[in-house]
């Protein structure tokens, strides 16, 4: 909604028009207003008692459209853009004690779409407190292994699979 209501924050195509897709508008991860707004919102959530924020869509659009970024010399990659925003959020929020996590795309990991999404699993797990992924019982082990490829990442406590169906074993509370 932000990109649609405040055009100055919108991610742009190479021609300078606002990028939109079936998800709606996307914000430019380098836009100063967007960054300031996200940090302010997170700080307010911390003051309200929240101890963690999980960003959804901390990624770039999956379309192959060429994108243009605000205030950048050169042409950063989509990964550069996502990592730069994650670093900014981590640095700006570290003093608050708020955990910074993200919901990443299983497609980015399993179908190797990270170059389009910008969600590089060799970098993001180092910047985030937790990595959350919508998973199935069939792919959860593969996702865990891919995200925890770096031995410094503790998958037991920092990998959070969101499962639509509870596994056969264990105790779970389910709805529906």
For the regions a protein language model found, what residue spans apply to each?
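Aromatic-lined carbohydrate-recognition surfaces of secreted/lumenal glycan-active proteins
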Residues: 1, 54-55, 76-117, 153-167
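Active-site-adjacent "subsite" loops/lids of carbohydrate-active enzymes
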Residues: 1-43
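Active-site mouth loops of central-metabolism enzymes
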Residues: 21-37, 106-114, 169-175
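An active-site-proximal structural segment forming one wall of the substrate-binding cleft
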Residues: 26-57, 120-124
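Generic structural signal for well-ordered alpha-helices
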Residues: 42-43, 82-90, 121, 125, ...
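Active-site-proximal loop/short-helix segments
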Residues: 51-80
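Substrate-binding cleft/loops of secretory-pathway carbohydrate-active enzymes
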Residues: 101-137, 173
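Substrate-binding cleft of secreted/luminal carbohydrate-active enzymes
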Residues: 128-176
């Amino acid at each position: 909604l932000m990109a649609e209501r405040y055009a100055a924050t919108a991610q742009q195509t190479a021609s300078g028009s606002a990028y939109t897709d079936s998800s709606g508008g996307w914000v430019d991860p380098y836009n100063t207003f967007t960054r300031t707004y996200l940090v302010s919102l997170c700080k307010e959530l911390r003051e309200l008692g929240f101890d963690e924020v999980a960003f959804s869509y901390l990624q770039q659009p999956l379309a192959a459209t060429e994108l243009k970024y605000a205030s950048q010399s050169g042409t950063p990659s989509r990964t550069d853009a996502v990592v730069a925003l994650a670093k900014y959020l981590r640095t700006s929020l570290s003093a608050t004690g708020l955990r910074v996590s993200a919901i990443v795309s299983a497609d980015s990991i399993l179908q190797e779409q990270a170059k389009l999404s910008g969600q590089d699993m060799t970098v993001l797990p180092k910047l985030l407190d937790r990595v959350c992924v919508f998973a199935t019982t069939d792919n959860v082990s593969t996702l865990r292994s891919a995200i925890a490829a770096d031995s410094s990442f503790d998958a037991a406590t920092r990998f959070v699979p969101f499962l639509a169906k509870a596994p056969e074993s264990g105790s779970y509370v389910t709805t529906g």
